[in-house]
């Protein structure tokens, strides 16, 4: 169940980040509201995850996968450009997250 919580947290973090970009500095009501609601849900489920998984694995997975998925959203929805260094860095993040989850410590 903790990984379900983590998936929900990561997903709502990515949604919240997309809303945040769309809110244009909180000047648009609906995207601003979406940002607040999404991040509220995100942190609720992140805290539920931390009740079951170690902080180091939880946070590294949340931050790493959130960054990767946010990058994908920024490319697809906002038409932002990336370069080779960005791609290599994302691959390294994925390798790090997978390694932590396979070989990292548990309680």
Curated annotation (Swiss-Prot):
The record's annotation in Gene3D superfamilies points to: 1.10.3730.20
* Entry's transmembrane regions: 26-46, 57-77, 84-104
* Main localization category: membrane
Pfam families, per this entry?
A: Multi_Drug_Res
Q: Which keywords does this Swiss-Prot/TrEMBL entry list? A: Cell membrane, Membrane, Plasmid, Transmembrane, Transmembrane helix, Transport
Looking at the keywords, is Zinc present? no
Query: Can you say where in the cell this protein is located?
Result: Cell membrane
Q: Which GO terms describe its molecular function?
A: amino-acid betaine transmembrane transporter activity; antiporter activity; choline transmembrane transporter activity
Q: Answer whether the UniProt record assigns the keyword tRNA-binding to this protein.
A: no
Protein family per UniProt: Belongs to the drug/metabolite transporter (DMT) superfamily. Small multidrug resistance (SMR) (TC 2.A.7.1) family.
Function of the protein: Multidrug exporter. Is implicated for the resistance to bacteriocidal quaternary ammonium compounds.
- Name of the protein in its database record: Quaternary ammonium compound-resistance protein QacC
What is the species listed in this Swiss-Prot or TrEMBL entry?
Staphylococcus sp. (strain ST827)
């Amino acid at each position: 169940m903790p990984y379900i919580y983590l998936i929900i947290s990561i997903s709502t973090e990515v949604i919240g980040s997309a809303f945040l970009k769309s809110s244009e500095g909180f000047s648009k009501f609906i995207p601003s509201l979406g940002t607040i609601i999404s991040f509220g849900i995100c942190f609720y489920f992140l805290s539920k995850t931390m009740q079951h998984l170690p902080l180091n694995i939880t946070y590294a997975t949340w931050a790493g996968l959130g960054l990767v998925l946010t990058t994908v959203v920024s490319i697809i929805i906002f038409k932002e450009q990336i370069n080779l260094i960005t791609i290599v860095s994302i691959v390294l993040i994925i390798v790090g997250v997978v390694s932590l989850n396979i070989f990292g410590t548990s309680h």
